[in-house]
């Protein structure tokens, strides 16, 4: 999707203030089923569960976490769509779930069939190589590819695969794109030497710090925190980005008071770095990124509507 995070980041303060009614008197009518689209034990799953623990302790709400993985969050959306919209069922996904993944699944649904509640953070998505490759820069990788080396490029979603294809096309290199399940599988593949390079969404941090991994580029619409000088995809000939933003959503037509109360509670926890979850978000994702209300709705819908443009570009 074209550069949507820059616009989103600029709107954060406006969007946060859009939730003007904190609905402090609202309480869930029962336990909240928290559906999580990510594998147990990962950073995103931990983030969701820590938010639940914090809200249980602070507000007395009760959460029942449940893993609903598969198809980049679409399995969760399909299971959630007919659930009660009274705040007792919410799900943690990424914006791509309601955007590219929902569009490409072709299940007859759009983001308008759900309630976007709030975002929490954006992943530090980068193009990362093993230090053993000897590539100290993106240019060195391209030189190797043009010299005939088979560049094995790991991706963990169809959308990222299309970005890798467009990147290779723009640079005149035919990457050997390897699709795996999850960012940890990309990390493991690069570390083991089964891949040369791949998209990683923050999991690369310790390896980069230790000198085992090398950042070649930012796959976001903004610089990476760990290497602000790394080139962006737009600098490398790609008009799309790999922004990955964590968010909560619910079934369609959630009452405004309910949506506002849940959004306020979650965003307060995510943005407070003195909380365990806030500290995790700061450490793993560089800090919170809060979008709510009309700004969030517009950003999600734009992500969805830009999907066929990316698909068409990758098919040419």
Regions found by a protein language model. Give the residues of each.
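A ligand-binding cleft/hinge motif common to bilobed small-molecule-binding domains
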Residues: 95-106, 161-171, 192, 196-228, ...
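Sec/Tat signal peptide C-region and signal peptidase I cleavage site
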Residues: 17-23
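Alpha-to-beta junction loops
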Residues: 61, 83-93, 149-151, 173, ...
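Hinge/capping helix and adjacent helix->loop/strand transition within the periplasmic-binding protein
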Residues: 26-31, 55, 79-88, 101-185, ...
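Short helices/loops that flank or line small-molecule/ion binding pockets
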Residues: 74-85, 143-146, 166-170, 184-195, ...
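Short helix-initiation/N-cap motifs at beta->coil->alpha
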Residues: 68-76, 159, 178-191, 201-203, ...
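Short beta-strand->loop
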Residues: 110-120, 174-178, 196, 209-241
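Extracytoplasmic "Venus flytrap"
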Residues: 33-48, 69-71, 153-158
């Amino acid at each position: 999707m074209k550069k949507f995070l820059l616009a989103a980041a600029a709107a954060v303060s406006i969007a946060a203030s859009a939730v003007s009614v904190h609905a402090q008197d609202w309480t869930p009518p029962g336990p909240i089923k928290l559906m999580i689209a990510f594998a147990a034990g990962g950073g995103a799953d931990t983030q969701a569960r820590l938010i639940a623990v914090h809200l249980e302790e602070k507000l007395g709400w009760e959460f029942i976490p449940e893993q609903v993985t598969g198809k980049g969050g679409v399995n969760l959306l399909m299971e959630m769509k007919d659930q009660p919209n009274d705040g007792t069922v919410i799900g943690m996904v990424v914006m791509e779930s309601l955007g590219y993944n929902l569009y490409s699944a072709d299940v007859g649904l759009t983001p308008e069939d759900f309630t976007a509640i709030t975002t929490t953070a954006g992943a530090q998505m980068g193009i990362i190589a093993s230090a053993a490759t000897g590539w100290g820069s993106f240019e060195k990788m391209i030189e190797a590819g043009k010299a005939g080396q088979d560049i094995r490029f790991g991706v963990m979603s169809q959308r990222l695969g299309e970005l890798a294809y467009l990147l290779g096309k723009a640079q005149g290199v035919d990457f050997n794109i390897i699709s795996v399940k999850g960012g940890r599988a990309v990390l493991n593949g690069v570390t083991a030497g089964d891949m040369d390079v791949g998209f990683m969404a923050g999991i690369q941090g310790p390896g980069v710090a230790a000198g085992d991994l090398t950042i070649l580029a930012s796959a976001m619409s903004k610089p990476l925190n760990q290497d602000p000088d790394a080139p962006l995809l737009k600098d490398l000939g790609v008009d799309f980005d790999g922004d990955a933003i964590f968010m909560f959503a619910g079934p369609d037509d959630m009452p405004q008071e309910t949506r506002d109360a849940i959004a306020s509670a979650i965003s307060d926890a995510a943005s407070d770095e003195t909380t365990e979850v806030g500290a995790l978000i700061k450490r793993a994702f560089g800090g919170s990124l809060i979008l709510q209300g009309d700004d969030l709705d517009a950003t999600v819908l734009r992500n969805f509507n830009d999907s066929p443009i990316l698909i068409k570009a990758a098919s040419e």
